[in-house]
């Protein structure tokens, strides 16, 4: 059976004890994760952003969901319900953005990203839920229509009615975000999980050619500019947004890996 995680520096390691410090030594390779996802999928992007924010080196591999690789027997051995992306560290596996983001955040360098204050934690989760439930489905449709469908079928004719309906449906949550950002640098004040969720969706919205939905809202645009230059939450000199796949990367099915030079 094909090993879908046979990529990157972690896959080339032959001795777990030498690479993962089981004898007690903390070694750099202990922090190399393997992320298997797709560049046109928001959940994959969220996990990449989280890995940068938490200072975690990550080797990225592409799971070709256009060709149905997420439904293959090899992938279902890793993720029985077909959740994408999937993460591996040593002999540990987890699939789905929620589990992966939580694992990386707990596993990462430095302080925790989630706020300790109960009210702020609730607010973070509220805005994360809005992103996933009210924005995600419509962004996914736009990405499918504008990018992925044409990758699978070069003569595909976009469904204009569905595109227009998705754009219209995005107005209310984007307006709400615009109001929220009138008083905050980041969505709940400090950078949080909520910013990661929204960054992934709005990045793909922009790459799908629908960036006017961002730029026509001044506070959202200013926030988007800030997250586009936001350095690692854990203090490393690396910007997550710089590693997110652009349109050409999506079409070429390419994902960037994360290299941390300053632990």
Q: What positions do the PLM features span?
A:
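GST-like fold's C-terminal all-alpha helical module
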Residues: 2-5, 133-226
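GST-like domain detector, emphasizing the conserved glutathione-binding G-site
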Residues: 2-164, 254, 262
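Short, solvent-exposed turn/loop segments enriched in Gly/Ser/Thr/Pro and often Arg
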Residues: 38, 64, 193, 239-243
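Short polybasic/polar patches that bind polyanions
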Residues: 52, 206, 229
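A late-sequence structural motif
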Residues: 230-231, 236
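Terminal-tail/helix-coil boundary detector
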Residues: 236-263
